[in-house]
């Protein structure tokens, strides 16, 4: 089972956390879930060049707090918070509510599966060699002190091949069946002239023991 399910969703009941934190009546639940989905996609597309690793939406009554985890907070905040305020007004215009925006810097971007996968996909779109890109990414990730293992799977018409295939690169340990294992996972897509190439990244950061 550990090979088939999403490693992050599989561990939500042990040590994971949801991207949406709120309670809603059953009649409003579907509407709120859909709104969270579109808000998250809008935020990620608006700051695709910056590198958003996580979007957390918290709701309480009529208030809504959105926390953005990114590599370079200064590019989102802007001079004296002008860019952040401008984006807040764009959210109000598009979705009909004025949220409270918080920006948190990702201290270790090389141990974030989201940022690593997006970086690999971006370089593949620039027509770089997939083997060189992935091996370099794995070496960079393994230099982090908290990382115990990393695996990258790349699928599609690699290097423009006529037949699509999957290449898997792995270093260290990735215990997918261990529930207490802190495994970060993400899937990114590289849109190339040959078609779409899928990039999957697993990063193992040790075990989590709760007393």
Curated annotation (Swiss-Prot):
GO terms for biological process: translation. Signal peptide: none annotated. CDD domains: KH-II_30S_S3. The keyword Signal does not apply. InterPro entries: KH_dom, KH_dom-like_a/b, KH_dom_type_2, KH_sf_prok-type, Ribosomal_S3_C_sf, Ribosomal_uS3_bac-typ, Ribosomal_uS3_C. The keyword Cell cycle does not apply. Keywords: Ribonucleoprotein, Ribosomal protein, RNA-binding, rRNA-binding. PROSITE patterns: KH_TYPE_2. One of its GO terms (cellular component) is cytosolic small ribosomal subunit. Gene3D superfamilies: 3.30.300.20, Ribosomal protein S3, C-terminal domain (3.30.1140.32). It comes from the Bacteria. Residues 39-107 form the KH type-2 domain. GO terms for molecular function: mRNA binding; rRNA binding; structural constituent of ribosome. SMART domains: KH (SM00322). Part of the 30S ribosomal subunit. Forms a tight complex with proteins S10 and S14. Binds the lower part of the 30S subunit head. Binds mRNA in the 70S ribosome, positioning it for translation. HAMAP family: Ribosomal_uS3_B. Belongs to the universal ribosomal protein uS3 family. This is Small ribosomal subunit protein uS3.
